[in-house]
């Protein structure tokens, strides 16, 4: 159906030319194999009600020689959290300033039932799990590094952690206040709202 063809098109897009460090065509990988068949994955998921897609983009991703071990460990954590083995494929992209991994998960659990992932786990839980693993690999970031990253977020043309904090603090009418925990936080919020 339409969903299966869209999923196949997405996998082809992820494997396009020019996305590896060497500018080559990217290769899908999985739990164990460094090269997996996207067509086989698509066929297994053809009848799934949905598919989960997310991007893991560690802030210090450029410090990883290879993102595969991080992605595999992250997926292991997700399986522990969700209480099921997952059928997934991933691909690493190095064609932007921020190396990142696209992960696609079938919409079935290991018992063949529809896989359910809570919205807040998709929006924050996966990010928190990835950050924990990066801290284990590279060590925790200093306060200065975190502040530097937040200052840069003020000018970003994408949803940032500042935006998420503003949305979380919005009232029922979706009105946000610039007052923050401290002067630095207030400056970040005001700068982002002015953008």
Please provide the spans of the model-predicted regions.
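N-terminal nicking endonuclease/strand-transfer module with a His-rich metal-binding environment
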Residues: 1-99, 103-195
